């Protein structure tokens, strides 16, 4: 950084804010086998072993004055990731399948940076899926049921780090799960028309989410308090997502209408839909929301493809996309970081004279974009 118009604090041009030495070792090996036992019935087995090693050293002076802890890690993770499944073609148009898989995810660099006071754990996922599929020349459809059980799932906390990135943590997520049903269908009754639709309905929960806070007792001493909130909604996990696409085409021209519905989302994992903002005198000022509301949007794309063989090119496509044609006002992201504690005998999410412990990212209103692509 060489220049800042209005620095908020003492500014040092060309200061080296950060230096870090890090090594990551990633080794994996796998065995895969598949067998068809009889016509239409097959099974498969995938076995993977993976080793991940982290070595990070940081002199702890990457902020002026050494006000932040440096990044240091000496971690090794060994993962065994099996997957087994079965597939059966009942007849020409109908098939069913089932699978079980286990996978692991190591913490990434941002996790070390945002959770430097914790000993980070790897995420473990066990996934069971069962599905059915129908397919014909003009129509195809499928249904998939899944249950995903997590240990130490990395979930977004709703908080931001010092550069505005979302913080993910598994310090208190413990056991959690995601379960639901996925549906999709495609219908093409004529060469000039196609209809695609898919939907996902899910339940996403943390089993025993915990929070902690500090209180001052009658003697003026700081006392650590905590609470187990039990089963709570997983943050940023809508329980309904529906997409619908109509496609019209004639010779080189095409038109596509895309609609999407996304259900409401929690900004934290605590199940609080709002926090209470108190004035300095202890009176209630207002409630500040900590939810992303559901929304429905529609986009339209128009395009035309034409050949360019006469000038030595394959073809070109010119198009224009109109986004959010109904000018829907909605937020597609946000953050929330209130305090927690007992207020009038009730566990409360709150702040004192601070309306900015929750924020939202509004999406663009109606807008459009033109494009041109050329294939050589």
Regions inferred by a protein language model and the residue ranges of each:
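Residue-level signature of outer-membrane beta-barrel architecture
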Residues: 25, 31-36, 78, 86-90, ...
